[in-house]
Amino acid sequence: NPDQPSQGEYRVSLTYEEWENAVETLCEHTLSTFGWETSGLISQEQVTLPDSFGPTYEGFLSLQEEAGFHLSPYAGKTVTRYTYGIQNYPTGEDNVYADLLVYNRKIVGGDIRTASLDGFMTSLVYPDD
């Protein structure tokens, strides 16, 4: 019966707000695991990934793979992008953000970026000094 948990599996009933809090906690923990300190959640929004990742996305996919993510299975899917302020970018630069892509309460991608015109985008892996 698909509605019954299998052996060793537990099902928990949570409200929407409890799920959102759990996902935000997961995001914050993930960023911390990579070495990032955040100023908290800035925004979250639904975004649809492209149906296919052509040559334009090679650099972006490479950043994802560097951090252990593989976005190809999520092509065409609508994900939630959680954006956090980053407080400890090694150069001390301001206005640095972390974006995490979440699909069905699972983090499937992310990056570190700045919003400035001459900005950058890197993987979630904390840069070596």
State what each model feature region is.
Residues 1, 36, 68-69, 96, ...:
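Intrinsic structural disorder
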Residues 2-40:
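N-terminal, intrinsically disordered, polar/charged segments of Gram-positive cell-envelope systems
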Residues 1-2, 129:
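Accessible peptide chain termini
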Residues 33-93:
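Mature extracytoplasmic domains of secretory-pathway proteins
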Residues 75-129:
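Extracytoplasmic electrostatic interaction patches
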Residues 9, 15-18, 33-35, 56, ...:
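Intrinsically disordered, low-complexity N-terminal regions enriched in serine/proline/glycine
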